[in-house]
Amino acid sequence: NGCFNFAKYKGTSNLQKLDDSLHLARCALNPTTMQHNKYKIVPAKSPKKVAIIGGGIGGMETALVLKQRGHNPVIFEKTDKLGGLFITASAMSFKENDKQLITWYKREVEKQGIEIRFNTEINDIGTLGGYDAIVIATGSVPRKMPIPGFEKTLTFTQLLAEKAPVGDKVLFMGGGQSSCEAAYDLILQGKHPIIVEFKDDLIADNATCLANTSYLRDAMEYHKVPVHLNCTITNIGDGVANVKNVKTGETFTVEFDNIINGIGFVPTPALGKNKAKTYKVGDCVAIGNLRTVIWRAWQVAMDI
């Protein structure tokens, strides 16, 4: 089965294209759903040894499809576990299905006998030899903002995956989906989030399911979360942030126990060059979502 997409919220369109699946649906996890004639796993004509840099969802999906096609993938993962940033994305109390997805990928990688080299960070793919192709799946890193005190912010990984103590009043710098989900998780813990968002609406994103975003917007309103739209943080002090409304010019302060960097992510830096043909998948190409990560990984694995 596929997941139906909602079309628009306050003029923000949903760009999940449906034209090649009879305008019915697309599945984030399985590109072949309802599109079996277009997307099929075809055996490779010439098996290749492929290095995959990064063991997140994109890296694991690439490895699994490559293995099914007869290639020999090897995953290089800089930490001691698979999952990448999706570990953080699935860390919230209401993300049990996402946790199960990581478990499924790990199990499938193990069942397929795919080689994994943990605690191995590749900073220059030029050092890799003996591979016919290289797939870079290194994901993204938090965006930074050049304002005084920015170093005081915590990342989503520190908040969600590492469970850093944050106190009661938690200020989110940015009101995208990640911030709203994390804020909702804090609400469930009895804490009091505050959101400062530069745009005129929360989750002003054109590639997110409206069912999810509408629920989060409603949750912020229902729980009376202070939301400051059209605003930007200009300075971060000890327990207090200076905020400016970009439309009216009004300035004010917001007190907090901790502040979270929720202004988004940027692709990881390039890793050099290699004589082997190189591909990229996931957020290191462009920041996307679970579907864009899995679909691009699937397509790249089919192109090798």
Where are these regions (language model features)?
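Cysteine-cluster motifs in flexible loop/terminal segments that predominantly coordinate metals
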Residues: 1-47
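Active-site/binding-pocket entry motifs
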Residues: 9, 30-36, 141-142, 159-160, ...
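Positively charged, proline/Ser/Thr-rich regional signature most characteristic
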Residues: 11, 15-25, 136-151
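Short acidic/His/Gly/Ser-rich catalytic and metal-binding motifs that mark active-site loops
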Residues: 36-37, 82-86, 144-145
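Rossmann-like dinucleotide/flavin-binding elements
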Residues: 44-78, 117-130, 137-147, 157-208, ...
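Rossmann-like dinucleotide-binding cores of NAD(P)H-dependent redox enzymes
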Residues: 75-112, 183-233
